[in-house]
Regions:
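Membrane-interface alpha helices of multi-pass inner-membrane proteins
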Residues: 165-179, 183-188, 293-300
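Residue-level detector of transmembrane insertion/anchoring sites
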Residues: 135, 168, 293, 330, ...
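Residue-level detector of alpha-helical transmembrane segments in integral membrane proteins
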Residues: 127, 172, 308, 332-335, ...
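Hydrophobic alpha-helix-in-membranes signature
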Residues: 71, 79, 133, 178, ...
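Primarily membrane-embedded glycan-assembly and transfer machineries that use lipid-linked glycans
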Residues: 1-165, 194-314, 318, 322, ...
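Transmembrane helical bundles and short interhelical boundary loops of multi-pass, membrane-embedded
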Residues: 327-401
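Membrane-interfacial entry segments at the cytosolic side of transmembrane helices
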Residues: 191-202, 327-333
């Protein structure tokens, strides 16, 4: 990759001026302050988890609330918040979510060997905060999806440095808080990293089993939450889901057919992610695109599937912008993001309950765009990995910029 003035990658990785950082800090501070003013309890979604923890402290079952969709270990993790007054949570939660989103972006940059002081570091996060509506939604909701947005790039960063068991432990810890990153265990399976796979499975299993023993309803997750997730019976929640299985029936497609199409698309996405992994090309794109592909495939079929779930995969893809052949260099990546521009009004899709159609467009186009990476090898891509345990990703001596 050239670093001359005519090449955008060279410009992006040069140091950012102080004015860019000032703009970024102002934007993030304004986003957090706006959320603190609007949400008296630290965000609607965070309040569900905190309420579950308070119910448990009072001797009740957290799973009495059908909207509590977390493992028992999340109840104990929310206890510190349950002990804080609402006035503190009102400020603390949006600030914490904003910091975690910035940390997720930093991990994605480090994975791609992009300097943290670069123009891409400043402009990328500013663009996400200003130009990607789910960023603001996540800050206002305080949803624990933010733990997954940090854990995935952090785990892939560890894996890129050969610390696979640590990567598995990070994924396991994130699943213990919210089981959103469960599909990433397939990456460890693809790579033949059995210790990492064991860590990713055992950490949430042991944490949840220990926490369940302290619950009045130890099997509540399996008897109440899991059936709710499998059947998606909440009509109100369904209006905000972005998966094809939820959106297509609203367009008149039979529910069974919609579910079948979503499952088929998810399976195809996993196959493409596997093919992407089998390409032994050096550099970080292999890890980033495989991980993002697995998560986007899961979002096609998962219930629920909300717009802010996209933030789990998007930073990984955007941080690869300096690399030729990356997803972010393709036009369809940017087309997918157009419906998420704040303030852009779409005819017949103005209402909040209809934004799921825009979210579904973004999800599906991103999923297809990433999946294509598994079938269209760029020029200079390495040979396929032989059968058996996958080797360490080949380390380039330096970033190509």
């Amino acid at each position: 990759m050239r670093t001359g003035k005519s090449d955008i990658s060279g410009w992006l990785v040069r140091p950012a001026g102080g004015h860019l950082w000032a703009v970024l800090v102002t934007v993030l501070a304004a986003s957090a302050a706006h959320a603190a003013r609007l949400t008296p309890d630290g965000g609607m979604d965070n309040a569900i988890v905190v309420r579950a923890a308070r119910t448990w402290l009072d001797g009740g079952s957290p799973y009495d609330d059908p909207h509590f969709l977390y493992l028992p270990s999340a109840v104990l993790a929310a206890v510190p918040q349950a002990l804080l007054p609402g006035a503190v949570l009102r400020v603390l939660v949006p600030c914490a979510v904003t910091v975690l989103l910035a940390l997720a972006w930093a991990c994605a940059l480090l994975l791609h060997r992009v300097p943290l002081g670069s123009r891409l570091a400043a402009l990328g996060l500013t663009g996400l905060a200003l130009g990607f509506a789910p960023f603001g939604h996540l800050v206002r909701l305080g949803n624990w999806t933010v733990t997954a947005t940090v854990a995935l790039p952090l785990a892939l960063l560890l894996a890129s440095r050969g610390r696979w068991t640590g990567a598995g432990a990070v994924i396991g810890a994130a699943v213990a808080l919210k089981p959103l990153l469960a599909p990433v265990v397939l990456l460890f399976l693809f790579a033949g990293r059995w210790r990492a796979l064991a860590a990713a499975v055992l950490v949430p299993a042991l944490a949840s089993a220990a926490a369940a023993l302290a619950m009045p309803d130890p099997a509540g997750f399996f008897t109440r939450t899991l059936p709710f997730l499998l059947h998606g019976d909440d009509g109100f929640v369904r209006l905000y889901e972005a998966s094809p299985a939820a959106v297509l029936p609203r367009l008149g497609v039979p529910a069974a057919l919609a579910q079948g199409l979503a499952v088929a698309a998810a399976c195809a996405g996993v196959l493409c992610a596997y093919r992407r992994w089998r390409r032994a090309d050096p550099g970080p794109l292999r890890l980033a695109e495989t991980g993002a592909g697995l998560m986007l495939s899961a979002f096609l079929v998962s219930r629920p599937s909300y717009d802010h779930y996209l933030l789990v995969a998007l930073p990984l893809l955007l941080a690869g912008l300096p690399y030729a052949g990356s997803v972010a260099r393709g036009v369809w990546f940017w087309i997918a993001l157009v419906p998420q521009a704040p303030g852009l009004t779409w005819p017949w899709l103005e209402g909040e309950r209809r934004r799921a159609f825009r979210d579904a467009f973004t999800l599906c186009v991103l999923a297809v765009t990433v999946a294509r990476q598994g079938w269209t090898a760029p020029a200079g891509a390495g040979e396929r990995v032989p059968q058996g345990r996958a080797p360490e990703p080949e380390r380039a001596p330096a970033a190509p910029f």
